[in-house]
């Protein structure tokens, strides 16, 4: 069994009725992983991947033997001398994130911390606004926090394009789901 990933490494669970490979995990490093070859008697076997919510199965193919693919499962009939290789490819689910900073009554630089692909960043308003570029992020839970800036008060924080953001002062926790276009707007006066 070969496991390939696009967009990041992960751990993937498989089930089968193949002796020596009943329930197993493959963890990709450099976007690939594989089991060792396992000798099996002739017969029919099943193999299936338990697809994590953060990935989509984007490819499944087998070579050797007789296989019937019904994604994410495979029925494999192994004959004498067959060498069967099944390759599963998963692509990391992503969303996009944009942070907008609006100011009323002037311009300033505002610092943010985040555990997103943006990392820690600063936005300096010009004409009362500034934003990050739309950034692709893997699906998951993230925090974005605006650090208090002297002379400015946070008067509004709203995130759209995501379900149930949690606000706590200048911090928002978002749950980025597949294909969401999340926009968080911080307004200071």
Model-derived segments and spans:
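Solvent-exposed loop/turn and edge beta-strand elements of beta-rich ligand-binding domains
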Residues: 1-189
């Amino acid at each position: 069994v070969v496991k390939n990933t696009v967009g990041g490494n992960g751990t993937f669970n498989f089930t089968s009725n193949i002796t020596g490979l009943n329930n197993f995990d493959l963890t990709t490093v450099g976007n690939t992983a594989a089991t060792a070859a396992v000798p099996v008697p002739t017969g029919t076997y099943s193999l299936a991947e338990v697809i994590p919510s953060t990935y989509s199965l984007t490819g499944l193919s087998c070579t050797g033997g007789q296989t019937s693919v019904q994604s994410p499962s495979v029925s494999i009939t192994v004959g004498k001398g067959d060498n069967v290789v099944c390759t599963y490819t998963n692509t990391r689910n992503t969303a996009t994130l944009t942070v907008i900073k609006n100011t009323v009554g002037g311009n300033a630089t505002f610092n943010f911390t985040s555990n997103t692909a943006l990392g820690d960043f600063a936005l300096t308003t010009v004409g009362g606004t500034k934003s990050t570029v739309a950034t692709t992020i893997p699906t998951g839970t993230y925090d974005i926090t605006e650090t208090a800036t002297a002379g400015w008060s946070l008067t509004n924080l709203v995130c759209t394009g995501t379900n149930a953001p949690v606000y706590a002062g200048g911090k928002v926790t978002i749950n980025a789901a597949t294909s969401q276009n999340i926009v968080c707007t911080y307004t200071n006066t």
